C-alpha cells in the first residue's frame, strides 16, 4: 500500500511539473544589415546561418535592429548612419519573431524612413517594441502569449543626446524617461494583464565592460516597478550581469551583426537565452559568438560566459 501511495504522489508531482507554464526568450544584440550582411543577403546568402541553432525552440526570438530598413530618406548629420534595404527582412524573419527599435540609429534617415520601416516590418510579420507612429504606439508593449503566460516586452533608448523620440503626432522611438517607463511597466501589469514584463534598454557607454552607476540605478528602479528582467545593449561590448531581488540584469550582450567594429572586444558577443515561469525568470545562459571581418556572427563555444539558474545564488560562468 505504501508503494502505491508513493507512486501516486510521484505521478502527481510529475504532472504538476509538466503543467507548470514556462516561456523562453532569445535575445541578440546590435544588428546592422546595411553593409556586408546586406550584400550577402542580396547575393542569396544568410548572415545568421552559422548561429541559427542558438535560436532553436525559443518561444520568442528578438534582436536589436540598429539600422533603419527603408528605401527613402536622407542621412542625418552624424558620424555613422545605417540603412538597409527591405530585402533583408525575409532573412531576418527566418530567425526572429521581432526586433527592438529604441536605439540611436532608428532615426538615421528621418521620420518618413522610420515610418516606412514600420510598414515593412508589419508586412514581414516581424513584431517590434520601442517604436511607433506616435508616442502611444512607441510606448506600447509587444505582447506575447505562450503556454498560458502573457509576456509584455518593452524597449527604451537612453543614449544621449536625447533625440528622435516619438511625439503625439510624430513617429519615433520610446525614450527612457524614468517616470514614463515606470508607468509603462505598471500599465503592462494592470491594463494589459501581463504575467511577466521584460525591459530592453539601449544604454551605457561604448567600450565600457562594466555597467555604470546610472545603469544600475535605473535597472533597480525598473525592477522595483515590476519588471522581471532587464536586458541591455549599446556599449558594443559585453558587460557584467547581476541579480537584484532575484531578478536578472544583463547590462549588455554586445554586438550581433556589425561590420563597424573598432577593436577585438567589439567582435566578442553573446546570444542570450532566458527562461521564465509564472514566478519570473528561472534561468539564463549566454552563448558566445564572434564576429568575423564582415561583422557576421559565428559560434565561439570554448569561451566561458555568464549563466544562472534559480536557486544557485549569484550567476556563474559556463562553457557551452
Residues covered by each model-derived region:
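Bacterial N-terminal signal peptides
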Residues: 4-12
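Acidic, metal/ion-coordinating pockets
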Residues: 15, 19-320
Amino acid at each position: 500500500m505504501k508503494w502505491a501511495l508513493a507512486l501516486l504522489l510521484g505521478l502527481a508531482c510529475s504532472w504538476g511539473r509538466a503543467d507548470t507554464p514556462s516561456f523562453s526568450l532569445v535575445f541578440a544584440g546590435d544588428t546592422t544589415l546595411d553593409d556586408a550582411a546586406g550584400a550577402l543577403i542580396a547575393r542569396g546568402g544568410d548572415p545568421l546561418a552559422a548561429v541559427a541553432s542558438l535560436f532553436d525552440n525559443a518561444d520568442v526570438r528578438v534582436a536589436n535592429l540598429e539600422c533603419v530598413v527603408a528605401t527613402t530618406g536622407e542621412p542625418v548629420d552624424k558620424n555613422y548612419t545605417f540603412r538597409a534595404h527591405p530585402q533583408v527582412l525575409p532573412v531576418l524573419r527566418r530567425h526572429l519573431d521581432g526586433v527592438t527599435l529604441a536605439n540611436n540609429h532608428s532615426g538615421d534617415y528621418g521620420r518618413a524612413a522610420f515610418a516606412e520601416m514600420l510598414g515593412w516590418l508589419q508586412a514581414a510579420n516581424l513584431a517590434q517594441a520601442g517604436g511607433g507612429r506616435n508616442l502611444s504606439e512607441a510606448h506600447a508593449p509587444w505582447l506575447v502569449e505562450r503556454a498560458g503566460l502573457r509576456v509584455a516586452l518593452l524597449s527604451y533608448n537612453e543614449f544621449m543626446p536625447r533625440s528622435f523620440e516619438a511625439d503625439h503626432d510624430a513617429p519615433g522611438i520610446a525614450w527612457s524617461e524614468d517616470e514614463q517607463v515606470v508607468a509603462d511597466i505598471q500599465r503592462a501589469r494592470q491594463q494589459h494583464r501581463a504575467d511577466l514584463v521584460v525591459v530592453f534598454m539601449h544604454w551605457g557607454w561604448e567600450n565600457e565592460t562594466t555597467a555604470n552607476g546610472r545603469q544600475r540605478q535605473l535597472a533597480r528602479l525598473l525592477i522595483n516597478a515590476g519588471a522581471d528582467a532587464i536586458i541591455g545593449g549599446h556599449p558594443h561590448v559585453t558587460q557584467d550581469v547581476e541579480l537584484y531581488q532575484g531578478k536578472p540584469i544583463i547590462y549588455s550582450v554586445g554586438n550581433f551583426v556589425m561590420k563597424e567594429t573598432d577593436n577585438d572586444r567589439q567582435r566578442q558577443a553573446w546570444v542570450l537565452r532566458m527562461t521564465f515561469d509564472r514566478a519570473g525568470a528561472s534561468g539564463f545562459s549566454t552563448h558566445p559568438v564572434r564576429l568575423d571581418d564582415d561583422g557576421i556572427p559565428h559560434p565561439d563555444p570554448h569561451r566561458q560566459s555568464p549563466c544562472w539558474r534559480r536557486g544557485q545564488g549569484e550567476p556563474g560562468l559556463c562553457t557551452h
